[in-house]
Amino acid sequence: MERSRTGGSSTYSMSTANVPIITISDDDDELTIWEEPRKSPISSNSYSDERNHSLSSTSNSSVERSIIITISDDESEATERNQQEVVDRAISNNLTEKRRRSVESFHRLHSKERKLEVKSRKKSRTSSSSMEASTSCTFPARQTKTKRHKRKTYSTISSFAPHHSTICAELRNVNPARIADFRHPSIFEYSDMSLNERREHWKKEMKVIKKHNDIRLMHEEAVRFDDIIELDPTLNGYYRRFMGAEQSTRALFMAVRCLATFGRNFYEEPERDHGEEEIPEELDRYFEKLIYVAPRTRIRITDDIHLSNDTHRIPVYTDAKGETLKTVKIPNPLLYDHIINNMVDKVKEPLLYEAIKIAGSSENVIRCKCCSQDPVVNCFDNKDCPCFIANQFLQSRNKTTDTNEKLKFHTFQPLMYNDGNPTYYNTVGFACSPKCACKGACTNNATYLIQKKLYSIEIYRADPQIGFGIRSTLFIPAGTPIIEYCGELVDGERLHSSLENYSYQLTDCEGDKHLYNLLREKYKNNPEYYDVLDELSKHHFHLDAKMQGSVGRFANHSCTPNMEPLRLFKEGFTPANMRMIFFTLKDIFPGEPLTLDYGSEYKVFRRQRCLCRTFACRSGPHYEKFSNLDGKLIASCFVRLHHASRIRYSVDLQLIERFYSVGKVEEVRVDPCVSFSKYNLKWRRQLSTATCERLENVIEIELSDEDS
């Protein structure tokens, strides 16, 4: 049946040949459907007499007979059901039962439920039908005619305005390493808001929290942490949080990094004879600055910035003096979209999109088939695990000094890096992913503890000049991965200069030259993969967290940081397969701010003084005195600071055992906390004095051991 539009009428014609052909022509697309004659059990060269008689009788009659039905303008405006009834009545007396079944099949295929199926199979059906018709039928099949669909248009987005919802709605995020993200339904409403609407939204959520208590909060978070470990079979018995021996302070390692900020190399300096040289007395002034103690009255902007649908919360507080609900200013950096996976926009980054498709092919993707009856699969040290093989391949080629052990990317072992060289471009690992048979619940996944959301973190603002920062409310051992830095993966050539303050460089042409040489050597027999790696090596990519990112975007700068970034791959070796995680360089005590070193150019970039206020601060009042110390004395400074935090932590634990060990703890964090009484505060001062006297002997013994 053919439909053509001429003037104000529509004409339908139905061919009455033995091979009925039904054609639908429209302005947008054209679809041809045909029915092949059924094959006879006899070969195609010897049809039965009945078949030959049928063919001859058909040929004697007019094979190309057609029934023409003309429908007026009024009838063409009728409903589709009425038009079909008109056609069926007209051809019912002229078609055989076989042709009627063909018409009925046309109506079924023309329904909305089958449209997509027809379009997806038309190509394969055309080729198979043409081959079958040429071998077993005297009537050749007619080719299917289709028009190409119009190119899909995407919205134009700005890097300075919220666009996370647009990218997700248009299915533009092609990050291959994304994992399931369970959010509260309100996240969709929030993502569609403008900046001003988000600011008003948080203003309505603000509350004044009175009688806040950091000691009680520390106890509750510790109880919730232990419950998570106990109830999770993949953690219970596999992961243990502990305060290690004295080497856990990482004093010497921290001294090497501190000297690097002074522009000095620890390994190239000659040994000094200290004689009577001692640690400067000014170091004692920095003890109180190690731990941030929140005030009793706080303004809570929100109890959960990332609108999670589980028990994990990331609250936001402002503790600036003199602020009220009416005077609180919510800056634009707080109006971001919280994400737990990097974003790759296939429209803006066509090179990355092409690399993702090549790396994700069945022959190039790296994922293991390891499985076990135990909750945690032992992929690490498994020579048959392709993910561990890739991890071992990268570890064996990481740059480090011969005297230090190479960093291991084990799930439950600390990421202890003893080399004084920068870790970022010299060390990279490989981890199992949720697409593996082990689902990432194995010993070869350094991001597993981050995905479990073990360690509680809060966002706070104590000084408007510094802005918002993050602090831990739990004790975190050295070498623990705690945060993944997420953002939108952007080519450095397109990154606006004003966005550099909220971006972190993921790859570098010069810094990753050694890495790309290794990967090209590995895939030299795979020309397609080799070419895309060669092209990627000419670009440097950034993680832009201006409008979408994770809680890691709030980590402030410090000249003596307690965290450092580290990179690892999943599934493949493109920048889109790379993840950036922050791990602790030293033991983190409850209340301690989590910081990074932004680099030597940070002060020049910001055009202002550094406000980290550490003893090694480049803008600090005692910078000259501490910068002239040698590495061993600086290491002793870090030991003293660690012991000061350790004494305070021990006192707090005894307070918790005395006053808070009995009582119900909520599953999620709830404000306000119960405050201390005057008696409790007096007892704490007495306990602190006694504990300090008792622990000073331990400190002197440990210091003497280190000097020896």
Swiss-Prot record:
Its EC number is 2.1.1.-, 2.1.1.366. Residues 36-63, 101-152 are annotated as: Disordered. Residues 54-63, 126-136 have a biased composition (Low complexity). Broadly expressed in the nervous system, including head, body and tail neurons. SMART domains: SET (SM00317). InterPro entries: Class_V-like_SAM-MTase, SET_dom, SET_dom_sf. The keyword Ribosomal protein does not apply. Disruption phenotype: RNAi-mediated knockdown prevents age-related decline in the expression of bas-1, a serotonin (5-HT) and dopamine synthesizing enzyme (DOPA decarboxylase). RNAi-mediated knockdown improves behavioral performance in pharyngeal pumping in aged worms. It is found in: Nucleus; Chromosome. S-adenosyl-L-methionine binds at residue 598. The keyword Secreted does not apply. One of its GO terms (biological process) is methylation. It comes from the Eukaryota. It catalyses: N(6)-methyl-L-lysyl(9)-[histone H3] + S-adenosyl-L-methionine = N(6),N(6)-dimethyl-L-lysyl(9)-[histone H3] + S-adenosyl-L-homocysteine + H(+); N(6),N(6)-dimethyl-L-lysyl(9)-[histone H3] + S-adenosyl-L-methionine = N(6),N(6),N(6)-trimethyl-L-lysyl(9)-[histone H3] + S-adenosyl-L-homocysteine + H(+). Keywords: Chromosome, Methyltransferase, Nucleus, S-adenosyl-L-methionine, Transferase. Pfam families: SET. One of its GO terms (cellular component) is chromatin. GO terms for molecular function: histone H3 methyltransferase activity; histone H3K9 dimethyltransferase activity; histone H3K9 trimethyltransferase activity; histone H3K9me2 methyltransferase activity. Residues 455-599 form the SET domain. Histone methyltransferase that specifically di- and trimethylates 'Lys-9' of histone H3 (H3K9me2 and H3K9me3, respectively); involved in positively modulating the rate of age-related behavioral deterioration. May repress the expression of mitochondrial function-related genes by occupying their promoter regions, working in concert with probable chromatin reader protein, baz-2. Involved in modulation of the mitochondrial unfolded protein response (UPR). Regulates level of expression of bas-1, a serotonin (5-HT) and dopamine synthesizing enzyme (DOPA decarboxylase). Interacts with baz-2. Belongs to the class V-like SAM-binding methyltransferase superfamily. This is Histone-lysine N-methyltransferase set-6.
